[in-house]
């Protein structure tokens, strides 16, 4: 099921407050720290041997920003998220061989990070809308695996 009109409104109304670099760095850092086996996809990033190394790694920050910027672009295509991510899904499945469960894991890390940055503004309703969006994105990115 797609996102509701109300969910889309909540997301578009709040996304403009996002600092893609800060959010991306923290969310990807959380993923790499919490799920250390995901580090195998980022061997070119240098030292990821500790939480401190991860959270101070410029390659992590740059890639996190890239991913969060992509989410921002997907928000502009909420009516066709699968279409928007079709090529990226294929790339992640056929070239990078990323475990598709990691897309869902990243969505969880991103949701936690948004909660941290939004504070009280991250209401249960807004949280649920973002979770629905991140599930749709994870599903779209996993499409290349089906």
Swiss-Prot record:
GO terms for cellular component: blood microparticle; haptoglobin-hemoglobin complex; hemoglobin complex. Red blood cells. The keyword Ligase does not apply. Keywords: Heme, Iron, Metal-binding, Oxygen transport, Transport. Belongs to the globin family. Involved in oxygen transport from the lung to the various peripheral tissues. This is Hemoglobin subunit beta-2. The lineage of its organism: Eukaryota, Metazoa, Chordata, Craniata, Vertebrata.
């Amino acid at each position: 099921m797609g996102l509701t009109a109300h969910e889309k409104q909540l997301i578009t109304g709040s996304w403009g407050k996002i600092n893609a670099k800060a959010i991306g760095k923290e969310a990807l850092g959380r993923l790499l720290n919490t799920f250390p086996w995901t580090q195998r996809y980022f061997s070119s990033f240098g030292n990821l041997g500790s939480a401190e190394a991860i959270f101070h790694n410029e390659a992590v920050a740059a890639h996190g920003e890239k991913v969060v910027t992509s989410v921002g672009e997907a928000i502009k295509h909420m009516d066709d998220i699968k279409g928007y991510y079709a090529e990226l899904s294929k790339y992640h499945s056929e070239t990078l061989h990323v475990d598709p469960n990691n897309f869902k894991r990243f969505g969880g890390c991103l949701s936690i990070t948004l909660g941290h940055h939004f504070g009280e503004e991250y209401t249960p309703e807004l949280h649920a809308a973002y979770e629905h969006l991140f599930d749709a994105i994870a599903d779209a990115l996993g499409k290349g695996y089906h």
